[in-house]
Amino acid sequence: MTRQQKVVLVIGAGDATGGEIAKRFAKEGYVACVTRRQADKLQPLLDEIRAAGGQAHGFGSDARKADEVAALVETIERDIGPIEAFVFNIGANVPCSILDETPRKYFKIWEMACFAGFLTAQAVARRMVVRERGTILFTGATAGTRGGAGFAAFAGA
């Protein structure tokens, strides 16, 4: 692997949107660095990217924890290469009426969808600003703009 290869970091590379984003970047020649809280769940995605001729690395990381985020970014930049593109794709919806929503659950959903986005984007942006290049992308759901029954915490995040 040469240092000239472009690296993408996809936070929240699950079985749907995040995984598809990682596959698309890999198809375009990026080294896909993908994360989930449980690294073992990334193996099917890594296998699929590699089978299609792409390069991929999986990392278990909790994006809500600043120390884990800092270590993740440092490891990727040191061992794989500079992160040229960053995609934040964490979201969680546990349907619940606003009347029954608990502060704890609301906070946990906000922590995953918002706070983790801040921590990870900040860590990557600090590197990108020094290099004067890079792209940061956030995915989102329409619940954030139009809400709906059972989406109080998810839409608020």
Q: Residues of each region from the PLM?
A:
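Residue(s) in the substrate-gating loop at a strand-loop-helix junction
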Residues: 141
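Rossmann-fold cofactor-recognition segment
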Residues: 52-67
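Conserved glycine-rich Rossmann-like NAD(P)H-binding loop of the short-chain dehydrogenase/reductase
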Residues: 30-44
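A short, exposed helix-loop element centered on a Lys and neighboring polar residues
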Residues: 121-122
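Conserved glycine-rich cofactor-binding loop
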Residues: 14-16
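Active-site loop immediately N-terminal to the catalytic Tyr-X3-Lys motif
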Residues: 99, 146-152
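Substrate-binding pocket helix/loop in short-chain dehydrogenase/reductase
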Residues: 97-98, 105-110
